[in-house]
Amino acid sequence: MAASAFNIHKLVASHGDKGLLASALVDKLAHEQLEEQVQHQRRGLKVYIRNALDVKDSEIIRDRYGGKYDLHLTQQEQAPHGLAGALRLCELLDCLDSFPRTGLRQDLVLDFGGSWVTHYLRGHNVHCCSPCLGIRDKMRHTERLMTMRKVIVNDPDTFESRVPDFCTLPAEDCKVQAHFVISIHGGYDMGFKGLCRAMHAHGTTFLKGTMMFDGAMLFDTEGYLADLKCKWKKIKPRTYESEDQTPLLSRISDNLTTTIKDHTLIAFDFVDESTLSYVHKWENVKSFLTDQTYSYKGMTYGLERCLIQHGIMTYKIIAVPGTCPPELIRHCIWFTSLKDYVGLKIPVSQDLVEWKTVRILISTLRETEEIAMRCYSDKKNWLEQFKVILGVLSSKSSTIVINGMAMQAGERIDTSDYHYIGLAILLHTRMKYEQLGRMYDMWNSTFIRKFFASLTRPMRVFLSACVKTLFPTLRPRDEKEFLVKLSTFVTFNEVCQVDLDAEWDVISSAAFTAEMAVEDGKRLAEDRKQKAEAASQIPVDEIPDDTAESSDDTPREADTNQKSEPSSPELETLSTQTRSPITRLAQRASSMLEYSAYEAQLHDNAVSNLDRMWCMAGGDKKNNRLESNVKFVFETYHIVDPLVNVHFPTGRWLYRVPEGISYSVGFNEHGIGPKADGELYIVNADCVISNSKCLADTTLQYLAPTGTISLVDGVAGCGKTTAIKKMFNPATDVIVTANKKSALDVRQALFNCTDSKEATTFVRTADSILMNDTNEVQRVLVDEVVLLHFGQLCAVMSKLKAVRAICFGDSEQIAFCSRDASFDMRHSTIIPDETDTADTTFRSPQDVIKVVKCMASKALKKGTHSKYASWVSQSKVQRSVSSKAVASVTMVDLTEDRFYITMTQADKTALRTRARELNMSNDFIEHRIKTTHESQGVSEDHVTLVRLKTTKCDLFKAFKYCLVAVTRHKKTFRYEHVGKLDGDLIAECLARV
């Protein structure tokens, strides 16, 4: 929020609030500041607080986070400790905002002890370490599974592709690496040193967290966090609270079977609520109040307390590499609640032998003493004076009348203490009165008074100053028996020094992160600069203009006789090739390394997801068994992924295996891999084809290819597959596709069958070539190349030792898409040596030309070049598109002569279910109902696009998805939709044609 350079209040005070000029100026500045605040609030992140909060709680949360977030207090539901829960959400978002983002994706962040379902619902790139330390943790995991299941059932379009990212391992045992971590009230069970050890295990350099805080914990045994309405209390080992109603036998059993009571505990109880309380070891909580640094395995971790407000402390821990010279680290803990109090010693019991110190307001003590002094008299019985003091302390009115004078009553005193407090005040007052009287009598009767009276005033002032300097604490000694001055803060001093003989092995640090970011930025800038010069540096032969229509089946002489790139003895690995002065070679090596890392990440993700499910079902790393509630746990996962299943040693599956599905691997205590029929193991969709590890390892075995890559970038239906058929020469070529569906289509078009030896030999997927033996070829023909990662294309060329790759695709249709949103993808786009464009379609009817041009003008940014802006059609069909509103899936016109497309898997599943209800053929259900992504490359006479939801779906706004959907047909296209969807690009453009 912008701050004004003027102080409005001072301006009014100096110029007068009634002056016309001053008033106008003040009004203008006030309006500007208000406008800035409103605009800032509109730009801020909207945070919806569903917990019902009273007025005071609402002010507290707005006071702490109202300036940062656009808070919406919806008052939807009554929740336990509502303010604490609402603050916890804001604390989580605040801590996440402390860390950098890469583009639109946030860097991977760890969460120690957090709620993984919160991150799942918001789509955060966060891995949660949520160990099951007891039954309470298992209860929370079960509750979160139910929450996940509910949101998936209610909104499958949004959550069907999300996978919760968490593990059930303690933070110190988890091996996920990340620079940043948050701990929202997760440090109570770990302590400061435990958090540091966990940070070291994860290679983390920066932690930000929150916890409940009260400085009085350092000297009191119990206290109260007023804003949070939370009472805390220390529980000493082997002792019992007076409120503890646990049966005696249970207490004895607990003492014999557990060691938790060997430590002093601290309990947090929320007042007027019967929810479960929080109990932690006091030594762990205390460490955040007293500790400052911790050295562990070559790293020094420093704790800094950032903000303490409304009973919540925000802190950060930063890992520091290198030798640390000696430095005095000092911090203070302030007790703001004590500034208005004084300690008063009172008797514990009636025998007046034992005494304790209680806190009492200074104003109460002062006013009570004043009343006591007014009523004090040697002739009055002490009991009468005692009654007067007790009357003041126990008064229910805001004012009391003593000797005809109105006085303010003090703070309410605990009923069990106020008698003793009154006695202590009486004794203290009497002692003061008598001591002062004796001092005056003694002073008045001595020669010192007469001596001082004879001195001049300057001399008296000088002697008084000398006495004060020599005797600064001159006061009645016995006063300390009743009053104790309470310090408003405590300090902790520590000398931090780390001196190692060897250099520290810094896994990751903030400096390293910054250095890498700078290097990446420079490298990207250099790549952009050299792209324009790449063609002139490495001259290549041009493809003739009639490539798409050429019927010459023999390879061109320039292809077979192309000179190879000069190789250097130093370029023996992909890593060294990335530093090659030949830009093209460095780009290809970088893309191959990225593709290998990406496939390895997919494999690790699959293992992590399976391991999480195995642990959630009660499995471990030693025994081949799961808990009895396995169906309850896997029900939720089965909704997200229908291929999630459990294989029992008897050969039985928990769910029926879908027809045509065969699992190649499974997961149990031995990890992922092929399993025997007599084993207990779990599976999911990643277990059907588990080839990521093999693809990652195979790619690293080859160097970047030096051959020429040519791209024919054609519009939909321009005859790319026809051109491949004409160019194919079995003596020198192999045809590569991105997926199995495309391979089957090309085999059918080329050989009129899909499973013959010739068809499977000459038309193969890129995965098949990398994973299996294959013959070397001179030329590779690639269909739908935009669906391939550039690194995989290079790996295929390198394995086949091809000198040329002729690639066909549409750069404006759906391209390669990462299945891991956290992976920083930079080199996936194909970088050809030469490009030819085809802008004539033979498939799409004439009215589709207008529809696509309309979509391009609406969806693409102004100034974006698109070949569809000038594309033309050779089709004789003039009118093909239509739109139809339907009430539900039962109203969709399903016929086996049409091809059906959906944007989402949920709509696809609904259509297939409806087709089964109508007893339609399995061939139609399996092969003629597809998603848009699965339909890329398909060509059909009659196509129907179906939308069954009106909930927000960004795919209907994306030009590339809408383009694929409306360009699959030759004769007719029908858009059947339920209701109206805001931003529906296809519906808007169909209405204009």
UniProtKB/Swiss-Prot annotation:
Domain (+)RNA virus helicase ATP-binding: 682-838
A Gene Ontology term for the protein's cellular component: membrane
EC number: 3.6.4.-, 2.1.1.-
ATP-dependent helicase: annotated segments: 711-975
Bias type Acidic residues, positions: 542-552
Subcellular location: Host endoplasmic reticulum membrane
UniProt-listed PROSITE patterns: ALPHAVIRUS_MT, PSRV_HELICASE
Membrane topology: Peripheral membrane protein
One Pfam entry name: Vmethyltransf
Disordered, as annotated region: 525-581
(+)RNA virus helicase C-terminal domain ranges (all copies): 839-993
GO BP terms in the entry: methylation; mRNA modification; RNA processing
Composition bias, Low complexity: 564-576
Subunit annotation: Interacts with RNA-directed RNA polymerase 2a.
Family: Belongs to the bromoviridae replication protein 1a family.
Summary of the function given for this chain in its UniProt record: Involved in the virus replication. Contains a helicase domain and a methyltransferase domain. The methyltransferase domain is probably involved in viral RNA capping. Involved in the formation of ER membrane spherular invaginations in which RNA replication complexes form.
Protein name: Replication protein 1a
Organism, as annotated: Tomato aspermy virus (TAV)
